[in-house]
Amino acid sequence: MNQPELISIIVPVYKVEKYLDKCVESIVEQTYKNLEIILVDDGSPDNCPAMCDEWAQKDSRIKVIHKENGGLSSARNAGLDACKGDYIGFVDSDDWIEPDMYEYLLNIGMKNNADVSRCEFVIEAENSDITVDSQNDSELRVLSGDELIIELVNGDYNEGIMCNKLYKRRLFDSVRFKEGITIEDCLANYYIYKQQVTLVSSSAVKYHYLQRGDSITGTAFSEKSFDILKVHGEIMNSSADNPKIFEHCLKTYIRYNIIYLRTCIAYEKKFYRDDMRNEVKKYSSAILHSPICDKKLKFRVSLITYMFPLYKLMVNVKCHGRDVIRKIIR
């Protein structure tokens, strides 16, 4: 295909010297050649800054930004401020992509007059030998408007990742990544989709997502685990002017509150537990009267609102089993 459109690919780099070469090589070797590759060194303390500079010397399409450490969102925002492309893509620096990913995404986007094009991704464990069928004769779906936002909030948070997508640049004119949170992709996609965009989605697997043991998503329960509640709370509040979308946002927000409430009961984190219980109680009437909420969710909301001691007991028995039963018998 002709390649007049410039695609800017933003790659935040931090403590990934083991993986960086494989990542950048997969971008440099794309079949679509009209690329601007922006490596954002986010104050990495290892050999990554020098590796980025070496890559820039090898390929004139590569630009390097060196900055103080500010986190993933800060690095992506620095790339957005510097990029000049007609389209924008994101690749995490420990991941890699299929050789034709960006040519494929641009092609299906143009054919379907879409603002965003999306492919599937596969989660890879370190040292795995998974072979992926990345054929292009895959199922395509076109989504837009309310339907797109509802799909985003109803899926798990991986629905909202940025790295398996190609965006028209103008979508970021008023959107930046929120700093200081770990679920920044979902929130940024929400504000992009709120611009009434059209998205074409393909079932072709073009992106390889490395699941590292020390990655943010690979770590155990922590304070940052609650970021998903902040993100879905903000999305819910922002959608209050659209009853159809708000109902789905509320359902997802309460569902996550219950998931983390259960975890807090098991870990005996009373402060957070009370906050989440209060959120469930606050919206209990809306959930119990909602036509889109299933009986299981309504039952849990009822227990938390009206019979919380029983709910705590049920959670503890499920999590700690015989130890809880012994205490009751005593």
Annotate each predicted stretch with a short phrase.
Residues 1-230:
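Nucleotide-sugar donor-binding/catalytic module of glycosyltransferases
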Residues 144, 235-239, 302:
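Histidine- and aromatic-rich ligand-binding microenvironments
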Residues 186, 246-255:
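Alpha-helical scaffolds flanking conserved acidic
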Residues 197, 205-212, 218-245, 256-288:
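Catalytic core of nucleotide-sugar-dependent glycosyltransferases
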Residues 267-330:
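Membrane-interface aromatic/basic loop that binds lipid-linked glycans or pyrophosphate carriers
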